Amino acid sequence: LAVSMTLLSLLLGILLIHSRKTKEIRIMSETDALTGLYNRRAAEDHITRQMQEDGRNPGCVRPLISIDLDKFKQVNDTYGHLEGDALLIAVADTLRTSVRSSDIVGRIGGDEFVVYLSNVTDRQNAMAVAEKLCQVIRELSTMKKEWSNISASIGISFADHPNIKMEELYISADKAMYSAKENGRNQYQTL
Protein backbone atom coordinates (compact mmCIF):
# COMPACT_ATOMS: atom_id res chain seq x y z
CA LEU A 1 0.00 0.00 0.00
CA ALA A 2 2.83 2.38 0.86
CA VAL A 3 4.51 1.63 -2.48
CA SER A 4 1.23 2.23 -4.32
CA MET A 5 0.76 5.59 -2.57
CA THR A 6 4.33 6.60 -3.39
CA LEU A 7 3.86 5.64 -7.04
CA LEU A 8 0.54 7.49 -7.18
CA SER A 9 2.14 10.60 -5.65
CA LEU A 10 5.01 10.37 -8.11
CA LEU A 11 2.64 9.95 -11.05
CA LEU A 12 0.51 12.93 -9.95
CA GLY A 13 3.67 15.01 -9.57
CA ILE A 14 4.80 14.10 -13.08
CA LEU A 15 1.37 14.94 -14.51
CA LEU A 16 1.38 18.32 -12.74
CA ILE A 17 4.84 19.16 -14.05
CA HIS A 18 3.82 18.05 -17.56
CA SER A 19 0.70 20.21 -17.41
CA ARG A 20 2.69 23.27 -16.31
CA LYS A 21 5.34 22.74 -18.99
CA THR A 22 2.68 22.28 -21.67
CA LYS A 23 1.10 25.59 -20.64
CA GLU A 24 4.51 27.32 -20.63
CA ILE A 25 5.27 26.01 -24.12
CA ARG A 26 1.88 27.18 -25.42
CA ILE A 27 2.42 30.66 -23.96
CA MET A 28 5.93 30.82 -25.42
CA SER A 29 4.67 29.76 -28.84
CA GLU A 30 2.05 32.55 -28.84
CA THR A 31 4.13 35.35 -27.38
CA ASP A 32 6.52 37.79 -29.01
CA ALA A 33 9.70 37.28 -26.99
CA LEU A 34 10.66 40.97 -26.90
CA THR A 35 7.35 42.68 -26.13
CA GLY A 36 5.24 40.01 -24.47
CA LEU A 37 2.40 40.72 -26.91
CA TYR A 38 0.85 38.07 -29.11
CA ASN A 39 3.15 37.17 -32.00
CA ARG A 40 1.84 37.37 -35.56
CA ARG A 41 0.41 33.85 -35.74
CA ALA A 42 -1.25 34.01 -32.34
CA ALA A 43 -2.65 37.49 -33.02
CA GLU A 44 -4.16 36.26 -36.28
CA ASP A 45 -5.68 33.22 -34.55
CA HIS A 46 -7.15 35.20 -31.64
CA ILE A 47 -8.44 37.96 -33.93
CA THR A 48 -10.06 35.41 -36.25
CA ARG A 49 -11.88 33.79 -33.32
CA GLN A 50 -12.98 37.16 -31.90
CA MET A 51 -14.16 38.32 -35.34
CA GLN A 52 -16.33 35.20 -35.60
CA GLU A 53 -17.78 35.84 -32.15
CA ASP A 54 -18.38 39.54 -32.87
CA GLY A 55 -19.89 38.60 -36.24
CA ARG A 56 -22.81 37.01 -34.40
CA ASN A 57 -23.76 40.50 -33.21
CA PRO A 58 -25.12 42.34 -36.27
CA GLY A 59 -24.21 45.71 -34.72
CA CYS A 60 -20.47 45.03 -34.38
CA VAL A 61 -18.28 46.91 -36.86
CA ARG A 62 -15.24 44.66 -36.14
CA PRO A 63 -12.41 47.21 -36.45
CA LEU A 64 -8.81 46.20 -37.02
CA ILE A 65 -6.07 48.77 -36.44
CA SER A 66 -2.68 48.49 -38.14
CA ILE A 67 0.14 50.51 -36.57
CA ASP A 68 3.57 51.28 -37.98
CA LEU A 69 6.06 53.44 -36.10
CA ASP A 70 7.29 56.50 -37.95
CA LYS A 71 11.08 56.98 -38.05
CA PHE A 72 11.78 53.83 -36.05
CA LYS A 73 14.66 52.91 -38.37
CA GLN A 74 16.29 56.23 -37.45
CA VAL A 75 16.30 55.21 -33.76
CA ASN A 76 17.87 51.83 -34.59
CA ASP A 77 20.44 53.32 -36.98
CA THR A 78 21.41 56.24 -34.74
CA TYR A 79 21.25 54.75 -31.24
CA GLY A 80 21.49 51.01 -31.84
CA HIS A 81 19.21 48.01 -31.62
CA LEU A 82 19.08 48.00 -27.81
CA GLU A 83 17.50 51.46 -27.90
CA GLY A 84 15.16 50.31 -30.66
CA ASP A 85 14.18 47.31 -28.56
CA ALA A 86 13.54 49.54 -25.55
CA LEU A 87 11.24 51.67 -27.70
CA LEU A 88 9.35 48.62 -29.00
CA ILE A 89 8.82 47.43 -25.43
CA ALA A 90 7.55 50.89 -24.42
CA VAL A 91 5.18 50.97 -27.41
CA ALA A 92 3.88 47.49 -26.58
CA ASP A 93 3.25 48.49 -22.96
CA THR A 94 1.55 51.68 -24.12
CA LEU A 95 -0.72 49.82 -26.53
CA ARG A 96 -1.59 47.19 -23.93
CA THR A 97 -2.59 49.81 -21.34
CA SER A 98 -4.41 52.05 -23.82
CA VAL A 99 -7.05 49.54 -24.88
CA ARG A 100 -9.48 47.30 -23.03
CA SER A 101 -8.43 43.91 -21.73
CA SER A 102 -10.96 42.34 -24.14
CA ASP A 103 -9.15 43.86 -27.14
CA ILE A 104 -6.38 41.94 -28.90
CA VAL A 105 -2.91 43.47 -29.31
CA GLY A 106 -0.13 41.83 -31.28
CA ARG A 107 3.24 42.54 -32.79
CA ILE A 108 3.22 41.56 -36.44
CA GLY A 109 6.96 42.07 -36.86
CA GLY A 110 9.60 44.77 -36.70
CA ASP A 111 7.83 47.97 -35.70
CA GLU A 112 4.37 46.86 -36.86
CA PHE A 113 1.52 46.15 -34.47
CA VAL A 114 -2.18 45.31 -34.73
CA VAL A 115 -5.09 45.99 -32.41
CA TYR A 116 -8.49 44.38 -32.81
CA LEU A 117 -11.26 46.17 -30.92
CA SER A 118 -13.77 43.60 -29.77
CA ASN A 119 -17.49 44.20 -29.47
CA VAL A 120 -17.46 47.72 -30.95
CA THR A 121 -20.71 48.93 -32.49
CA ASP A 122 -19.72 52.47 -33.51
CA ARG A 123 -17.04 53.39 -36.04
CA GLN A 124 -16.51 56.69 -34.24
CA ASN A 125 -15.44 54.80 -31.11
CA ALA A 126 -12.83 52.91 -33.13
CA MET A 127 -11.56 56.13 -34.67
CA ALA A 128 -11.35 57.72 -31.21
CA VAL A 129 -9.19 54.78 -30.09
CA ALA A 130 -6.94 55.22 -33.14
CA GLU A 131 -6.58 58.92 -32.37
CA LYS A 132 -5.73 58.08 -28.76
CA LEU A 133 -3.11 55.55 -29.90
CA CYS A 134 -1.50 58.19 -32.13
CA GLN A 135 -1.38 60.53 -29.17
CA VAL A 136 0.02 58.10 -26.58
CA ILE A 137 2.69 56.84 -28.97
CA ARG A 138 3.64 60.44 -29.80
CA GLU A 139 3.91 61.12 -26.05
CA LEU A 140 6.66 58.49 -25.88
CA SER A 141 8.81 60.97 -27.84
CA THR A 142 9.02 63.13 -24.71
CA MET A 143 10.35 60.31 -22.52
CA LYS A 144 13.84 60.07 -24.02
CA LYS A 145 15.79 62.26 -26.42
CA GLU A 146 16.55 59.16 -28.51
CA TRP A 147 12.82 58.80 -29.18
CA SER A 148 12.17 62.46 -29.99
CA ASN A 149 10.94 61.85 -33.56
CA ILE A 150 8.71 58.86 -32.85
CA SER A 151 5.08 58.86 -33.91
CA ALA A 152 2.74 56.34 -35.51
CA SER A 153 0.92 55.95 -38.79
CA ILE A 154 -2.30 54.05 -38.18
CA GLY A 155 -4.82 52.45 -40.49
CA ILE A 156 -8.27 51.19 -39.57
CA SER A 157 -10.48 48.83 -41.51
CA PHE A 158 -13.92 47.53 -40.67
CA ALA A 159 -15.44 44.13 -41.44
CA ASP A 160 -18.40 45.33 -43.48
CA HIS A 161 -19.68 41.93 -44.51
CA PRO A 162 -20.06 38.83 -42.35
CA ASN A 163 -17.77 36.56 -44.35
CA ILE A 164 -14.69 38.77 -44.44
CA LYS A 165 -11.51 37.00 -43.40
CA MET A 166 -8.95 38.38 -40.98
CA GLU A 167 -6.34 38.49 -43.77
CA GLU A 168 -8.60 40.70 -45.91
CA LEU A 169 -9.28 42.99 -42.98
CA TYR A 170 -5.55 43.25 -42.28
CA ILE A 171 -4.73 44.08 -45.92
CA SER A 172 -7.28 46.91 -45.83
CA ALA A 173 -5.98 48.23 -42.50
CA ASP A 174 -2.42 48.06 -43.83
CA LYS A 175 -3.41 50.04 -46.95
CA ALA A 176 -5.02 52.67 -44.73
CA MET A 177 -1.86 52.79 -42.60
CA TYR A 178 0.30 53.40 -45.69
CA SER A 179 -2.12 56.14 -46.70
CA ALA A 180 -1.55 57.75 -43.28
CA LYS A 181 2.21 57.52 -43.85
CA GLU A 182 1.98 59.04 -47.33
CA ASN A 183 -0.20 61.88 -46.05
CA GLY A 184 2.23 63.15 -43.44
CA ARG A 185 2.50 60.44 -40.75
CA ASN A 186 1.45 60.79 -37.09
CA GLN A 187 -2.21 60.24 -37.98
CA TYR A 188 -4.79 57.58 -38.76
CA GLN A 189 -6.69 56.83 -41.93
CA THR A 190 -9.66 54.54 -42.53
CA LEU A 191 -10.68 52.28 -45.39
What is the role of each PLM region?
Residues L1-E24:
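Alpha-helical transmembrane signal-anchor helices
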Residues R26-E30, N39-P63, D70-R100, G106-G110, ...:
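Conserved long alpha-helical elements within nucleotide-processing catalytic cores of c-di-GMP signaling
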Residues P58-G59, R107, R123, I137-S153, ...:
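Catalytic core regions of nucleotide second-messenger enzymes
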Residues I67-L69, I154:
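Residues immediately flanking
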Residues D77, Y116-T121, R138, A159-D160:
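Residue-level recognition of strand-loop junctions within catalytic nucleotide-signaling folds
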Residues V105, A128, K132, E146-W147, ...:
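Cyclic nucleotide signaling catalytic output domains
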